[in-house]
Amino acid sequence: MVIALDAMGGDFGPVVTVPASLQALSLYPKLRLLLVGNPDAILPILATSKSIGLDRLTVIPARSVISGDARPSQAIRVSKDTSMRVALELIKSGRAHACVSAGNTGALMGLSKLVLKSVHGIERPALTTLLPHQKQGKTVILDLGANISCDGAMLVQFAIMGSVLSKQILGVSNPRVALLNIGSEETKGLDNIRHASRILHTISSIHYVGYVEANDLLMGKTDVLVCDGFIGNITLKTMEGVIRVILSTLQSSEKKNKLNWFMQIINSWIRKYLFKQFNQFNPDWYNGAHLVGLRSTVIKSHGAANQHAFIAAITQAMHSVEREVPEKISHQLSTVLSKNNH
């Protein structure tokens, strides 16, 4: 399997992506990587490495990088020879099976549509991630910011794609699908949400369970949670912020303790237990958002991802390719559209 990596994208660029690439090669013996970016920034880091698997890594030169604050429309116009564009073109030319980038989200979405095209029947691809919940499973949640405004038909498309992802990546045989809403009653919510709900009730191949509220996000009440990108992005980042504060507080509280030795032991045990419970929700463990709805696999890593988190994104790309997620989304969508047209 060959994956193209945008080595220059994200807040840290090659400082994170190159070491992460080397570690991924040591973890996955059958993996080959195409590291796209400025050789002057990449090669010095590689020169200091003694990692195994260097023979499975190729540096592909790219002159420039799309900045994180660039407007997507402008970035796309001047994207030629950027690390992101070159990485995507490697998929189009057949040299790579997937692409991973921590770069500008809007530019990645626009360029992916331009270079790789959407699956037939998908209006716009969506950003999705696999969010852990308290029942030791994971929930597919989409959209996470690729589409700020969505009509009911788009939400239905997201539901279909999320259901396929849950089956293929998580192995859920009959995924429960829900819409994120402000209440569980059918009369609640905006027109587009209620419209999507009515359509989903009519699709027999989708196990639609109705509405789920944000306070149930980590409770495991659904396998797929669908929302527009505006709500999804705010919801995810709020949850990630809270989890990081909790983990940071648990780690730092030991230094502030002035209890007697017995209470220190009890307090330490409780703190370690809580840390273990909350650490499963650490955003680093589930980094890597799929751009589902494209004809090939593209994974968006968090811009501030550390080395461990970027490896998680590479792993997500491998799983998507191995399980033929884009092809199966296309098949499922064509089946649903065919039934609805009869």
Curated annotation (Swiss-Prot):
It is found in: Cytoplasm. Disulfide bonds: none annotated. The keyword Transcription does not apply. GO terms for cellular component: cytoplasm. It catalyses: a fatty acyl-[ACP] + phosphate = an acyl phosphate + holo-[ACP]. Keywords: Cytoplasm, Lipid biosynthesis, Lipid metabolism, Phospholipid biosynthesis, Phospholipid metabolism, Transferase. One of its GO terms (biological process) is phospholipid biosynthetic process. InterPro entries: FA_synthesis (IPR003664), Phospholipid_synth_PlsX-like (IPR012281). One of its GO terms (molecular function) is phosphate:acyl-[acyl carrier protein] acyltransferase activity. Its EC number is 2.3.1.274. Pathway: Lipid metabolism; phospholipid metabolism. It comes from the Bacteria. Catalyzes the reversible formation of acyl-phosphate (acyl-PO(4)) from acyl-[acyl-carrier-protein] (acyl-ACP). This enzyme utilizes acyl-ACP as fatty acyl donor, but not acyl-CoA. Belongs to the PlsX family. Homodimer. Probably interacts with PlsY. HAMAP family: PlsX (MF_00019). This is Phosphate acyltransferase.
